[in-house]
């Protein structure tokens, strides 16, 4: 499973592809046209795993510890 969404709690924690965890003050942006997801400066916001609105997966507990 590839997690591409940020936490919704404002913790600015985000998992990009390849288990790349964005730290505080960064957010994950979804790559397009085959580009990889990357961490950029900005407040973390939920990012969908698919193109369906409201289709989010929880961040695994082990990443939040």
From Swiss-Prot:
UniProt region (Disordered), positions on chain = 32-65
Which residue pairs form cystines in this protein? 6-14, 16-28, 22-39
InterPro entries, per database record: Hirudin, Hirudin/antistatin, Prot_inh_hirudin
Acetylation as a keyword?
A: no
Its localization reads:
Secreted
What is the native source organism of this protein? Answer: Hirudo medicinalis
Task: Give the Sulfotyrosine positions (modified residues).
Answer: 63
Q: Which family does it belong to?
A: Belongs to the protease inhibitor I14 (hirudin) family.
Put simply, this protein is called Hirudin-3A'
Entries under SUPFAM superfamilies matching the protein: Leech antihemostatic proteins
Span list, region Interaction with thrombin active site: 1-3
* Acidic residues bias spans: 55-65
Q: Signal peptide location in the record?
A: none
Residue stretches in coiled coil:
none
Q: Where is this region: Interaction with fibrinogen-binding exosite of thrombin?
A: 55-65
Q: Which Pfam family, an example, fits this chain?
A: Hirudin
């Amino acid at each position: 499973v590839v997690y591409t969404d940020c936490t919704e709690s404002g913790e600015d924690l985000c998992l990009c592809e390849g288990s790349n965890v964005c730290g505080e003050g960064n957010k994950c942006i979804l790559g397009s046209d085959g580009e990889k997801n990357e961490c950029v400066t900005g407040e973390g916001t939920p990012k969908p795993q698919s193109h369906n609105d409201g289709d989010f997966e929880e961040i695994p507990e082990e990443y939040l510890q």
